Every structure is written in structure tokens, then in C-alpha cells.
């Protein structure tokens, strides 16, 4: 018996990955829906399967923690802590179809301290081999840039270069950042 092939488009749904959202510990973050708010119905927000907002009403459990704007369907989470991280899903109807907007919230500490560690070795030709390490107070999602004079280079935590006596003193700055903050440290005695 011959069965004709079924079109691949039947019953196949593409899932949209969550949008990454970062919040500063102790701060607040607002999550918005992707569609035009005026056209939405049956709006709700959930976090990790727990209902926060349903039919434009905030759950008593979240009254002090969130602010919900029923006009534009934005959810603002206040006084962020590690407990607030998770997957937030806005569900709503538009044109008789259910839609969702999903966020993956990560709460991070601000960078509070940046220190440059220096290791200098004098070489036989009177030049110096310089190793600099940028130490930072927090450890996740960090990015680095270094400034040496007027040059910006390297996205590593550590840099290495050589100096000749004719180079004189130079100034080096490490800029460290994560999605919620940035700090820098300078060393002008290299």
C-alpha cells in the first residue's frame, strides 16, 4: 500500500528561545511583551510555573515584589535577589491565537573591586617583560579590555608585553564589566 508523504509543515512548531535579561542585585528590572499591548487579551505572567499575574490581577504572594502595568502588560520586579532568577513567561491572546514572550532572568552582583597584579622581569638586554593580571571581585559573565597609552586592546584577563628603557613610564588601565556593571583600575608605575 502506498502512503503519500505528509507535508512537513503540519503540526510542527518552532519554539522561540527565551530572551536573556540581566538584573542588578538589589535593583529592579522590567519585562515587556513583544506585541502591541492594545491588541492583547487574557494576559498572564508566570515564573517557573508559578502564576504572578492573571487576568490583570497580581497574585497576593507577589504584591510587594512586582509592579504590573495592565495597559502595556509590562512586569517590573523590584529589589532583585538570587531567588528572582528564572524563566518568566508572558502569555496572551492576539487575533484569537495564543502567544508568549519568554525571558530568562539572571541576577548578578555589581563589580565592586578591580585590582591589577603586576609581574615584571628584567631581561638581559635591559628590557622588561611585563605580565599584568586584572583581578575582579565577581566571577561570572566578565569581559575585559585593556588600555595602554592611547591603545585599546585584548579582551583577556591577563596581558603581556615588553618594555625598553626608552619607553619610560606607561599607564595601563583594565576595564572589567559584566551585564550589570563595570569598573576599572589603572597602574601608571609600569
Model segments located where?
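Proline-enriched interdomain boundary motifs that mark the N-terminal boundary
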Residues: 12-17, 109-120
Amino acid at each position: 500500500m502506498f502512503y503519500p508523504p505528509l507535508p512537513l509543515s503540519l503540526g510542527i512548531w518552532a519554539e522561540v528561545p527565551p530572551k536573556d535579561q540581566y538584573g542588578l542585585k538589589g535593583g529592579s528590572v522590567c519585562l515587556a511583551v513583544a506585541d502591541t499591548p492594545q491588541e492583547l487579551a487574557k494576559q498572564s505572567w508566570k515564573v517557573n510555573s508559578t502564576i504572578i499575574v492573571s487576568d490583570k490581577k497580581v497574585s497576593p504572594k507577589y504584591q510587594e515584589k512586582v509592579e504590573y502595568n495592565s495597559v502595556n502588560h509590562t512586569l517590573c520586579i523590584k529589589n532583585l535577589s538570587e531567588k528572582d532568577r528564572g524563566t518568566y513567561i508572558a502569555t496572551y491572546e492576539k487575533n484569537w491565537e495564543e502567544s508568549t514572550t519568554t525571558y530568562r532572568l539572571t541576577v548578578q552582583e555589581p563589580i565592586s573591586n578591580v585590582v591589577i597584579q603586576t609581574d615584571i622581569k628584567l631581561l638581559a638586554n635591559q628590557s622588561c617583560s611585563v605580565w599584568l593580571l586584572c583581578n575582579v571581585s565577581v566571577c561570572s559573565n566578565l569581559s575585559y579590555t585593556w588600555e595602554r597609552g592611547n591603545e585599546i586592546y585584548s579582551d583577556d584577563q591577563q596581558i603581556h608585553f615588553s618594555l625598553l628603557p626608552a619607553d619610560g613610564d606607561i599607564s595601563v588601565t583594565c576595564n572589567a564589566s559584566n551585564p550589570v556593571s563595570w569598573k576599572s583600575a589603572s597602574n601608571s608605575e609600569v
